[in-house]
Amino acid sequence: MRSRNPFFYERFGVPDTVDGRFDMILLHSFCVINALNKQGQGGRELAQALYDVMFVDMDRSVREMGVGDLSVGKHVRRMMKAFNGRMHAYQAGIDNASLDEALMRNLYGTVTGTVDPTNLTIMGDYIRNQVAALNTMNPDRLMQGDIEWAPVPGAGIKQRAPIVEPQKTDQAVA
């Protein structure tokens, strides 16, 4: 639930919209999946399971927003494509300035007007800090989903992620 923290929207100018919230979910998912992928085969399998559960939930969310059954698959595929593109952009930019460019294009892409460059820098640093923290945390805790996020800069917020058991579903994501 870290991505829903109002601080990102109120202080750092992330749009408090469906798109802004979607991008915050993708950013935090990137951080976790990036760390899991470094934990060998078991980590890669868990990363894939997280991806699968995430998009089953996206499917449910799209339906709850009133998208018709015939269009849901198309919407979810578009979201998956967006996620995959962002994963590559964030991975490529984690060690350089192209992360800020990717954040500007994606996280702040729907902002009308000027994006405060300080917010962009803070968000880039925030993501880099999360990746570093997750890459150095105890692998057993990471694999159990016992994630401790690095603090949000300037917010004094440090948060543990609740361990959530995935719901079983018969739905397949197209």
Predicted regions and their residues:
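Surface/interface-facing alpha-helical segments and adjacent flexible terminal/loop regions used
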Residues: 1-174
